[in-house]
Structures are given as structure tokens and as C-alpha cells.
Amino acid sequence: MTPRAPSILSQWRELREWPPLETNALHVWRLSWSAWDEAALTSAAAYLTDEEFAQAEHMQMAAVKQRFIATRSSLRRILAGYLAGGEYAAPETARALCLQSGAHGKPALVPPRVRFNLTHTDENCLIAVAAHAEVGIDMEAVTRQRPLERIVRRFFSPAEQAALSGLAGDALTSAFYRIWTRKEAVIKALGEGLACPLHSFDVSADGEARLLAFRRPEIDVGAWRMLNVDVSPDYATAVAVRGPVESVSGYTFTPHQHP
């Protein structure tokens, strides 16, 4: 019987040696913006391409610039580490990686030797990596400030709307964000953006993340794997993988990890 990964990622390990990325493994890397001071950002800039550095220099808001440098340099270091055979990569190796955005904006490594996706909020960034299967990840701050009912009517499927009926208060808010992050993760894994209508498929509203139905015959629901990611009670996070997942690992990435 094929091993089945846990349905939730809740443990984060400090990196002591580079983890091997097995065929059906999923790795999720967590970055905390608070760990990036001015010295760390200066060092991180060495991993950016000339184009990325110029892009950062044109950003007017300091917080946006800092997050861009931290995210893009960490992404390059993480991907280069896998491709280097489990070792920290030098800046020139990380800079040499070709990252491109698809027709609907999904970033990818060219050629696609590993697959990845990322999401961020005001406090954290998560980078999901898989060896061969397309992956999508989404993280949202849980708040009641959004017009939840209007979003549900416009974007959720009839089955999802039915799952939310009768809920109110915190129960409704929690279920809404479970559905929303799971749907976003599926869309990001597909790489189609809103060209794939959000109401064209159903995800679960309860604690276990599942893709329940897809109204496109070419998509095999049974081939997908979904799981929750526990970042903090203030965030809802989900990962969708278009393929089998036999193991899940979470790692904390800091700017002080050096080759």
C-alpha cells in the first residue's frame, strides 16, 4: 500500500543539513519577515539577478522592497540547494537559475526540475516545493472584515454554499477561510488563474482538506492531495498537490543560514 502523508503540517524544523526531496515528498519552507534586518537584506541581495535587483530598487515602499528581496533570494537559495544535490548553493549558482512566470502569472523554474509555489502575508512567507507534481499554496489572515457573504455567493459552488448554510460568527469565518484557501491553492497548482472559475470545483469545508469534485472531465480528483498548514491561529493555509504525497516536512528558513 502506498504510504499516505498526514493531513496537516504543524511542525517546523530548523535546518541542520539540506533535506533530500524524494519523488512524492512535499516540503514547505517558512520565512518570518521579522528575522530580516538590514544586514541580512544586504547579504541576500547577492542572490538576486541584475533584473531582480533593479526591480527592487524601483520599489517605493520599504516594506515591499524588503519582502521582495527576502522572498526572491530565499526562493533562489532553496531551489538551488535541491539542484545542488543537498548542499547550500553559492550566490552565483542561485542567480543562474531561470525563473519565469506562466501565462497566468504562476512562477516556475525553467527547465522545471522541481515544482514550487509561494504565498505571503504581512508577517510570513511560505514556499512549497515538490519534485514532479504541480503544487499550489495559499495563506490568508483570518478576519471578519471581508464581505464574506458576497464572496460566497459570487465564487463558491452550490455545494460549498450549502456547507456554509446555517453557520454564523466564528464558525462561519473559519469555514469560509478553509474553503477560500483550499480553492486558491487548487487554482495556483493548476496555474490557470481565474481562467478556471472558482465555482467549477468543490472543496471541503470541514477540518480535513479535500478536493471533492471538478466539473472538468480531464481533471482526476482522485489524483490530487490537499492538506492544511498550521502557521498560527490567525491564519488559514492550505496546500494542493496534483499528484501523490507520501511525506510532508516543514522547515524554517532564516537569513543566517549560509553556504
Tell where the protein language model's regions lie, with residue ranges:
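Core catalytic alpha/beta fold that binds nucleotide/phospho-ligands
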Residues: 1-259
